[in-house]
């Protein structure tokens, strides 16, 4: 049982990785909210669909609201990509997926004036035999653009924890391998000792031990 308890977390991790590879899974990951001036910035917008909702007509609208201003349309997907006339014209790039579950866009050459609130609206009309339901989802991305990249304390801590976990798993696997090797070696030594003891018995004793005594 202790060995099972030690192996169960690793088996669970391997099972999750196997499922993720064999069966694509949609995960609604939030977007980054900080960008550096002059670099590209991906505005992530993911709207997952259930398996039975594959057939759908999807319309995507991206809006931008500057600080103290109003929303205005900067990008639209309706039967194809369409970049509308705006201050972002020529700097927006479609970064979504073919199934339109990921409808992200990338802002090229980010400037300080690009700080503000970005809104991603995803409208879907599902095609069923009996009815055609309409669903709309909204994602808000408050973006802050800085002149230089600042050190993110959270990312540093996460990176340190990742390395610690990696070292721990490596040591754990090494200990398990040594334990299994010693266990197999002891089993082989015991088998060899039993075989040696059997060979050391005189042949007469072997015959007597093999033939039952009749009264």
Swiss-Prot record:
Gene3D superfamilies: Immunoglobulins. It is a single-pass type I membrane protein. Coiled coil: none annotated. It comes from the Eukaryota. The keyword Cell membrane applies. GO terms for biological process: atrial cardiac muscle cell action potential; membrane depolarization during cardiac muscle cell action potential; positive regulation of heart rate; positive regulation of sodium ion transport; protein localization to plasma membrane; regulation of atrial cardiac muscle cell membrane depolarization; regulation of heart rate by cardiac conduction; regulation of ventricular cardiac muscle cell membrane depolarization. GO terms for cellular component: cytosol; intracellular membrane-bounded organelle; plasma membrane; voltage-gated sodium channel complex; Z disc. Pfam families: V-set. Residues 179-215 are cytoplasmic. Keywords: Cell membrane, Disulfide bond, Glycoprotein, Immunoglobulin domain, Ion channel, Ion transport, Membrane, Signal, Sodium, Sodium channel, Sodium transport, Transmembrane, Transmembrane helix, Transport, Voltage-gated channel. Residues 32-154 form the Ig-like C2-type domain. The chain crosses the membrane at residues 157-178. Residues 1-22 form the signal peptide. It is found in: Cell membrane. Glycans are attached at residues 95, 109, 113, 121. One of its GO terms (molecular function) is sodium channel inhibitor activity. Intramolecular disulfide bonds favor the voltage-gated sodium channel oligomeric complex assembly. N-glycosylated. A voltage-gated sodium (Nav) channel consists of an ion-conducting pore-forming alpha subunit functional on its own that is regulated by one or more beta subunits. Forms homodimers and homotrimers. SCN3B is non-covalently associated with alpha subunits and induces the formation of alpha subunit oligomers, including trimers. Interacts with SCN5A/Nav1.5; regulatory subunit of SCN5A/Nav1.5. Interacts with SCN7A/Nav2.1; probable regulatory subunit of SCN7A/Nav2.1. Interacts with SCN10A; regulatory subunit of SCN10A/Nav1.8. Belongs to the sodium channel auxiliary subunit SCN3B (TC 8.A.17) family. Regulatory subunit of multiple voltage-gated sodium (Nav) channels directly mediating the depolarization of excitable membranes. Navs, also called VGSCs (voltage-gated sodium channels) or VDSCs (voltage-dependent sodium channels), operate by switching between closed and open conformations depending on the voltage difference across the membrane. In the open conformation they allow Na(+) ions to selectively pass through the pore, along their electrochemical gradient. This is Sodium channel regulatory subunit beta-3. It comes from Bos taurus. The lineage of its organism: Eukaryota, Metazoa, Chordata, Craniata, Vertebrata.
């Amino acid at each position: 049982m202790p060995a099972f308890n030690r192996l169960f977390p690793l088996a669970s991790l391997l099972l999750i990785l196997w499922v993720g590879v064999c069966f694509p899974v949609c995960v609604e990951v939030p977007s980054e909210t900080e960008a550096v001036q002059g670099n590209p910035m991906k505005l992530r917008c993911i709207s997952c669909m259930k398996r039975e909702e594959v057939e759908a007509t999807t319309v995507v609208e991206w809006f931008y609201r500057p600080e103290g201003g109003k929303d205005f349309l900067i990008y639209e997907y309706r039967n194809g990509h369409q970049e509308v006339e705006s201050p972002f014209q020529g700097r927006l790039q479609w970064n979504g997926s073919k199934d339109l579950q990921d409808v992200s866009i990338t802002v090229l050459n980010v400037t300080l004036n690009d700080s503000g609130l970005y809104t991603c609206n995803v409208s879907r009309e599902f095609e069923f035999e009996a009815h055609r339901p309409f669903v709309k989802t909204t994602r808000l991305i408050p973006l802050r653009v800085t002149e230089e990249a600042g050190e993110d304390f959270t990312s540093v801590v996460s990176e340190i924890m990742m390395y610690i976990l990696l070292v721990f798993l490596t040591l754990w696997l090494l200990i398990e391998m040594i334990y299994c090797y010693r266990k197999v070696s002891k089993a082989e030594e015991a088998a060899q000792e039993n075989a040696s003891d059997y060979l050391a018995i005189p042949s007469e004793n072997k015959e007597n031990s093999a033939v039952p005594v009749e009264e």
